[in-house]
UniProtKB/Swiss-Prot annotation:
It is found in: Membrane. It catalyses: H2O(in) = H2O(out). The gene is AQP6. This is Aquaporin-5. InterPro entries: Aquaporin-like (IPR023271), Aquaporin_transptr (IPR034294), MIP (IPR000425).
Length: 540
């Protein structure tokens, strides 16, 4: 090198002073090469083609390249056989606090002309394509699972500009975005219809408003398209099966969510339940009275006393009521008795409109059951109720009243009052009717139910002169039961012997809310009695 008299170009980084790229020996694998070895022998680091260029003879002294050997060998993992693409990232140092405002970014890699450290930019904007090409196709997820977001692209074009008549612009948006500062001016804020070539409306600086108050937010004037004086009609013949089903379902859906529908369902359930209850009861009575000497009656002096007949009738009435109440109490409450319905209204368990519907259903159910027994069984129709064994009218009224009071009060305590045994209330109700029939069948026929006595009289066409006691007696018994029920409620019977069979929701010793409700009712009655609370008002 020193023996030659030629001038060598000055060595600067990876290029010569003339701008020629240094040729390095080719290698397909990355290798750990000391940087010191790379730059220590510039005479072997590159070779010039003598046919194309030869150093001229000159008297300039030979300049040796600067000694760039580091103090400690530094190894690099880069492939030195090919030039690095883009700028090579250098280790960042914490910038001065005045530049980063106290936040240190460990990814600082660039420096501006002023010497200020710049933050690193993500590879999303500056993609190293050489690095991508060097990667195997199997290691790139974008080749195995192509997705539109993997491809670099510029701003998507406004496709509607490729359509004829795009100058009219889209329909105006729902909201006015012209006042938003985060929207760039290059965003298309065309609202409404504008002429071809006209400037967008946001450029004028005026706030876009609706053309009229009749125009809706979606740009459609519903008022101008309304039919004057006529109602909108739908041609069912021009609808698809799905549209036809939807149109026909609208009135049905509205009706299904109404109280009228609920009353209708309860009425139907009460009619069917009363019919089934009295049908089995009448059929059993018909069987028990086959050998009776008195026609069209279940009791009478000529009938005589037969313990088997009395027991059979009591059992069939009690079990028929128990089974059918258990079936229908979820639908209508399973009352099957106008006297019980009246009692439920007086204690506030059911509203008056529901009670009226149930009353007519019970009367019709008694008539239907009587007609079924009359038409199905070949024996003489013998299920009517009359006084017997020298029973007076007054005695008959009070016998019916007391027996009915016992039945109605049983229903209040087992069904109306909620407790652990509420779900087996039909058993207790059926047993209550059973013991009442055991007492009353011989003397009054054991009616306890105006519908039970009214139905057979209608079917047979014969009304006895004492038929009225089967209305007055049960109604009187209902008032007796209601009075006693309200009396013990006023005395707070729940607090007298708590914890017997009350559940966690209704026992005041277990539920503090229930206890507060009882105390609030006590205070309300006290204030009402002292005149501080007007009758009919509620305690807030």
């Amino acid at each position: 090198m020193s023996g030659e008299g030629t001038d060598l170009p000055t060595f600067q980084s990876s290029r010569t002073a003339d701008g020629d790229v240094i040729n390095r020996p080719g290698s397909s694998q990355q290798q750990l090469v000391p940087i010191a070895h790379t730059i220590s022998s510039p005479s072997k680091a590159y070779q010039k083609d003598t046919a194309m260029w030869s150093p001229p003879l000159s008297s300039h002294p030979i300049m040796s390249p600067p000694d760039l050997t580091p103090q400690h060998p530094v190894f690099s993992t880069e492939d030195l056989t090919r030039p690095a693409a883009g700028l090579r990232r250098r280790p960042s140092v914490p910038p001065p606090r005045r530049y980063s405002n106290g936040d240190y970014d460990p990814k600082l890699s660039f420096t501006s002309d002023t010497g200020r450290a710049l933050r690193a930019r993500e590879d999303l904007y500056y993609s190293d394509r050489e690095r991508e090409n060097s990667m195997s196709s199997r290691t790139r997820a974008r080749d195995d699972h192509p997705h539109p977001d993997y491809h670099e692209r510029s701003r998507p074009p406004r496709t509607y500009r490729n359509v004829v008549g795009w100058e009219s612009g889209p329909q105006k948006s729902y909201f006015d975005d012209s006042s938003r500062s985060d929207l760039g001016k290059d965003r298309d804020l065309e609202k409404g219809m504008r002429e071809a070539g006209a400037a967008p409306e946001w450029a004028s600086g005026e706030k876009v408003r609706r053309k009229s108050t009749d125009e809706s937010i979606d740009g459609y004037n519903y008022e101008s398209h309304k039919r004057n004086g006529t109602k909108g009609t739908i041609d069912l013949n021009n609808l698809t099966p799905e549209e036809r089903a939807m149109v026909l379902r609208l009135p049905w859906t509205q009706w299904m969510n109404s109280n009228f529908k609920n009353h209708f369902v309860a009425t139907i359930g009460e009619f069917v339940g009363t019919t089934m209850f009295l049908f089995f009861a009448f059929a059993g009575t018909q069987v028990a009275n086959i050998d009776s000497n008195t026609v069209n009656t279940t009791t009478g002096a000529a009938t005589g006393f037969n313990i088997a007949v009395q027991l059979y009738i009591a059992v069939i009435f009690g079990f028929s009521l128990m089974v059918n109440v258990w079936i229908f109490f979820r639908i209508s409450g399973g009352l099957f008795n106008p006297a019980v319905t009246l009692g439920m209204v007086l204690v506030g368990a059911i509203p008056i409109p529901r009670a009226a519907c149930l009353f007519f259903a019970q009367i019709l159910g008694g008539i239907a059951a009587s007609g079924m027994v009359l038409g199905l069984f070949p024996t003489t129709f013998n299920v009517r109720t009359t006084l017997g064994a020298s029973t007076s009218t007054v005695q008959g009224v009070f016998i019916e009243a007391i027996l009915t009071a016992e039945l109605v009060f049983t229903i209040f305590m087992l069904a109306k009052e909620k407790h652990k045994a509420t779900f087996i209330a039909p058993v207790g109700i059926g047993l209550a009717l059973f013991i009442a029939e055991m007492v009353g069948v011989y003397y009054t026929g054991g009616s306890l139910n105006p519908a039970r006595s009214f139905g057979p009289c209608v079917v047979s066409g014969s009304f006895d002169k004492e038929h009225w006691i089967y209305w007055i007696g049960p109604i009187t018994g209902t008032f007796i039961a209601v009075f006693f029920y309200k009396f013990i409620k006023m005395l707070e019977y729940e607090m007298a012997n708590p914890g017997q069979d009350g559940d966690a929701k209704n026992d005041p010793t277990q539920n503090e809310k229930k206890r507060e409700q009882i105390l609030e009712e006590r205070n309300r009655r006290y204030e009402k009695r002292n005149g501080s609370l007007r009758p009919g008002s509620r305690l807030s």
